[in-house]
C-alpha cells in the first residue's frame, strides 16, 4: 500500500509565507505565491487561513509566540548572557539580509502600525523582546560581564539600536547586515563591560 502523503502543517505554511514576504511586498503577495512556496494547493491556504490578511496576522502571531523560545535557544547555545544577547541580535537580522527584503519588511511594518489587531500583536512581541533582553542583562551583571547598571533602560536602548542599525545599514549598504548590527550592539555595550570580565558559568 502506498503511504499517505504527509500533510503540510500550519507552521510549515507560515514559514513559507515568511520566506515569500522577504521577496514580495504586501501589495504584490498572493495566496498562490505562498501555496507554491509551501508546495500545497492555493485552496489549502484558503481553507486553513481564509484571506491574505488572516494569513499575515497568523504569521505575526506565530512569530510573537516564538520570541521567548528563541531567546531560550540562544541561551542554551551560547551560555554567556552577554554573548547570547549579541549573537541573538545578529541572528535576528536574517529576515532582512538585503536592502530589498528590508524594504519589504518596512512595507509589512506599515500594516503592523496601522491595523489595530496587528499592532496589538506587534506590541506584545516588542514587550517580550525587551523583557527577555533585560533578563539577559540582569544575568550579565550577576555574572560580572557587565557593570551594575539600569538594565531596564539599557534593554530599551538595545532594542532601539537593533532597529536603528538595520535601517541605517539599508541606507549605507556597507558589508553584511549581521556585521553592521554586531558593531552597533557591541559599541552600545562597550562602556558597560566590566573590567573584571571573566568567562561566565551562567546557564
Which ranges hold each PLM region?
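Generic hydrophobic, amphipathic alpha-helix propensity
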Residues: 9-18, 34, 59-63, 67, ...
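Helix-turn-helix
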Residues: 12, 19-54, 58
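Residues in soluble alpha-helical coiled-coils and helical-bundle/repeat scaffolds
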Residues: 50-54, 58, 76-80, 97, ...
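Hydrophobic alpha-helical connector segments
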Residues: 58, 69-102, 154-158, 182, ...
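Amphipathic alpha-helical packing segments from all-alpha helical-bundle domains
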Residues: 68, 98-106, 116-142, 153-156, ...
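Helix-loop "lid/cap" segments that line or gate small-molecule binding pockets
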Residues: 74, 90-96, 104-114, 187-191
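C-terminal peripheral helix-coil segments that are non-catalytic and often amphipathic
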Residues: 86-87, 91, 130-139, 160-161, ...
